[in-house]
């Protein structure tokens, strides 16, 4: 999912948990999002710049160490809205074979805070609710000439389109995102059956995230 669509405040820390992935037809179960998980941390370096890193815990269970590290930069903002860029580096290492790969990624998202509720502080505590929607594009780049199976790599640029919603209540933020993954590539003749809004092109994805702002 998109990381820190709305950057943290300067000096703020946050912990994040993510669940979800491409939607697949699983025999005997049905159509469900793949239960991929990550845990992560974010830090507001500046008012418009947040640094983050995430550990992919599901991959770890299968002997692959995978992390993504990057930044969320708000390049444009107006009252209740903004545009953020998320340059990210994804790295994976197979603990059994020693094979490793990396994939650069660049996301761009527009967000809009369509509802906001604040109450005056009482006994030192105030109450805040913010509702936001966002939409954007994710660009995944595969710089390798050959795939891990030895075949020629024909998918150097892998775009995806996402829409999402953020619910913030004080320090807690809940995020839901729906994604159209790789809509320009065929989803035929592969091991997993991926339903898609574009027939035999791409796949759909669903993600849920929770993060807590420590300060």
Where are these regions (language model features)?
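Outer-membrane beta-barrel transmembrane domain signature
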Residues: 96-215
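Residue-level detector of the transmembrane beta-barrel scaffold of outer-membrane proteins
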Residues: 14-16, 40, 50-52, 70, ...
């Amino acid at each position: 999912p998109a990381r820190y669509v709305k950057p943290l405040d300067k000096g703020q820390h946050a912990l994040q948990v993510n669940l979800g992935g491409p939607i697949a037809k699983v025999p005997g179960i049905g159509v469900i999002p793949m239960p991929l998980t990550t845990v992560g941390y974010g830090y507001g370096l500046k008012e418009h710049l947040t640094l983050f890193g995430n550990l992919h815990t599901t991959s770890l269970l299968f002997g692959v160490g995978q992390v993504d590290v990057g930044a969320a930069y708000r390049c444009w903002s107006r009252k209740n809205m903004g545009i953020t860029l998320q340059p990210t580096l994804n790295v994976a290492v197979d603990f059994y074979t020693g094979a490793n790969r990396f994939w650069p990624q660049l996301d761009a998202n527009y967000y809009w805070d369509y509802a906001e509720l604040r109450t005056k502080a009482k006994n030192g505590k105030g109450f805040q609710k913010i509702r936001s929607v966002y939409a954007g594009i994710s660009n995944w780049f595969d710089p390798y000439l050959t795939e891990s199976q030895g075949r020629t790599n024909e998918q150097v640029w892998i775009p995806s389109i996402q829409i999402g919603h953020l619910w913030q209540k004080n320090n807690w933020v809940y995020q839901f995102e729906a994604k159209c993954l790789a809509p320009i590539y065929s989803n035929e003749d592969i091991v997993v059956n991926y339903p898609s809004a574009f027939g035999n092109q791409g796949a759909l994805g669903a993600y849920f995230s929770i993060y807590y702002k420590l300060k």
